[in-house]
Amino acid sequence: MRSGVIAQKVGMTRVFTDAGEHIPVTVLRLSNCQVLGHRTSEKNGYVALQLGSGARKTVYLPKAERGQFAVAKVEPKRKVAEFRVSEDSLIPVGAEIQADHFVVGQFVDVTGTSVGKGFAGGMKRWNFGGLRATHGVSVSHRSIGSTGGRQDPGKTFKNKKMPGHMGVDRVTTLNLRVVQTDVERGLILVEGAVPGSKGGWIAVRDAVKKPLPKDAPKPGKFKVAGDDKVTADAPTEKEGA
């Protein structure tokens, strides 16, 4: 199981195929996505990679967070997240993951925070049909109607679909196809819509319900400071010694 990446949503556009068909895509940018630390089964009880992306001024960081970035020898990051991986998919601390970590044609799962809609009624929030336009209905055409409570049970049950705050939820969209990657600019173009507003942080992972392509690099495509790109086929320090 490979690591995912932390990307930033740039916006939507479209690309054209050789046949002239257009594909709507969302542009995701990798903003210096680096490995900050490892989580091991011996020390933490599970195996994961801690990644950071974006830039943040040191003056706004608490001392504890400054120390974490100092240990990893990386610049302070705006967004930090963990990705569960297998033991053979650990990437060295300080390495920067590249856009070609994902290959064209593979499917990915994306997770983000949906756009806030504020207080919404039942028709917008839950797709209710509303009440009749005439025949005795006045003013309350868009109301939700009965909430289901009579003398028995004498209450409205929890989790009843009612008007309330809509949006700003953690949303995952499955099986989006990677259309194109740009390593130089750190861009990943995925087909379809991605949850969140422009500038929002998105977690991109290999699709859990689709097979991983055979040409996908393992443990990933990354760059170590002062070195060229490294893949799983490259020898480790112990093997080269």
From Swiss-Prot:
Pfam families: Ribosomal_L3
Keyword Protein biosynthesis: no
Region described as Disordered: 139-166, 209-241
Key words, A-Z: Methylation, Ribonucleoprotein, Ribosomal protein, RNA-binding, rRNA-binding
Gene Ontology MF terms: rRNA binding; structural constituent of ribosome
Keyword RNA-binding: yes
Modified residues annotated as N5-methylglutamine in this record: Q151
An individual GO BP term: translation
GO-annotated cellular components: cytosolic large ribosomal subunit
Post-translational modifications reported in the UniProt record: Methylated by PrmB.
Subunit structure, as described in the record: Part of the 50S ribosomal subunit. Forms a cluster with proteins L14 and L19.
Family classification: Belongs to the universal ribosomal protein uL3 family.
Protein name: Large ribosomal subunit protein uL3
Species, as recorded: Nitrobacter hamburgensis (strain DSM 10229 / NCIMB 13809 / X14)
